[in-house]
């Protein structure tokens, strides 16, 4: 069960809730946020329902639920994995990626799902020299002389600082170096948010029109559907992002 419209219908969206499936719960507690639009995918992996899930991410929808549910999630570079058939938000940011319990399995899955797809132009940019053997570097010396950037988060708490230090020391012991990155910017920023609004309108219209036997063929149709069925689909939050996207175009 995934978040309604990938958390892109309302600024008041509830992660893990959909009008079809109800509320997805965080694996560690009923009162904790399952996070991200791929919340159900992360919980299914963590709780052992599946070995592998394929999440989708525009901005945090793989990394966040993977983080808070204690699994491994990878958001690949856009264009490495085909997005064909996936409900779009942003053609410049959307991608699919593996969600598993181990780095090794995540690397194997990424190798399997990566590659050229004539139905997704973003994959045209994959270098011809790409081997897709992402598991080949999973050795004890795989991090030797590698520099890894780590966004600093939670350092204001004692346990958070201890975990950051543990990450740094563990990677150093394996021959790598951690560079802590301070980033206080808000996401999405105004420019990025407008781009998301614009690309969503264009992308969702094209996606809906490519499907047969649907009663909706545009963002405007979706807005009208939600308004007509608000008691079911808008129980907890509205559709202000949909309105903004319609106006942005």
In which residue ranges do the predicted regions lie?
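Charged, often glycine-rich, active-site loop that binds/positions anionic groups
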Residues: 11, 15-18, 22, 190-203
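Predominant activation on well-ordered alpha-helical scaffold segments within soluble catalytic domains
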Residues: 42-46, 75, 104-111, 168, ...
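A short helix-breaking turn/cap at a secondary-structure junction
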Residues: 75-165, 228
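Acyltransferase
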Residues: 133-135, 159-183, 203-226
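Short helix-loop capping/hinge segments that flank enzyme active sites or metal/cofactor-binding pockets
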Residues: 142-151, 197-249
């Amino acid at each position: 069960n995934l978040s309604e419209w990938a958390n892109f219908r309302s600024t008041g969206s509830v992660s893990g809730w959909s009008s079809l499936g109800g509320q997805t719960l965080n694996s560690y507690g009923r009162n904790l946020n399952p996070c991200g639009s791929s919340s159900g995918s992360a919980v299914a992996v963590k709780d052992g329902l599946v070995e592998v899930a394929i999440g989708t991410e525009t901005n945090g929808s793989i990394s966040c639920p993977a983080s808070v549910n204690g699994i491994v999630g990878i958001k690949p570079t856009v264009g490495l994995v085909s997005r064909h058939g996936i409900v779009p938000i942003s053609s410049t940011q959307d991608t699919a990626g593996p969600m598993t319990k181990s780095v090794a399995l995540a690397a194997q899955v990424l190798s399997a799902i990566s590659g050229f797809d004539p139905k997704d132009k973003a994959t045209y940019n994959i270098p011809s020299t790409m081997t897709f053997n992402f598991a080949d570097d999973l050795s004890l010396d795989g991090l030797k002389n590698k520099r890894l950037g780590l966004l600093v988060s939670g350092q204001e708490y004692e346990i958070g600082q201890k975990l950051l230090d543990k990450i740094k020391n563990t990677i150093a012991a394996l021959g790598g170096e951690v560079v802590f990155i301070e980033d206080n910017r808000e996401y999405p920023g105004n420019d990025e948010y407008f781009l998301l609004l614009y690309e969503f309108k264009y992308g969702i219209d094209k996606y809906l029109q490519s499907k047969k036997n649907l009663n909706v063929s545009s963002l405007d149709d979706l807005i009208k559907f939600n308004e007509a069925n608000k008691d079911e689909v808008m129980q907890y939050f509205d559709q202000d992002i949909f309105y903004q996207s319609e106006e942005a175009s």
